[in-house]
């Protein structure tokens, strides 16, 4: 398996920032057994924050086929917490603003949520368990993911909002900027439709 990375940086970016990006990319690829074989780097006034595009190729082994069953009888399982990606980005970029209300310990803890952004491990567990569908929660937040999954399954969904996990740091940042946590960028969170949700939750918990 190999990948190439195209990195576009804002004009004011420093070499140290590019070095940090590449070190993080290498760590992530090493964890997944991926080799970075090439790429491209440029600076542009069109971006205000680094933009990284990854293209990966690999060998086809076997596909994860959807489990047969009635979509009206499925359980919904959500991994980690919603809003992790947005919380991490905002905390890292708006530390001074947030520090007017919150302690630095909370802000920097929120910025470190970036370590939760991979869904590879839970997707692998869900794949082995045999699930009906999986959806990487990102743009549009959990509300967007639920809508897209509902359309894919062709059914309506019954969801208890009180059971959707969200970090307190996310709640605080949402209150500060008047944001809806259910619509936040939520990379690192995987929405799964399974015939036996309790069994899947146990399998996910056993691998934490």
Predicted stretch roles:
Residues 1-208:
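Helix-biased detector of long, well-ordered alpha-helical tracts
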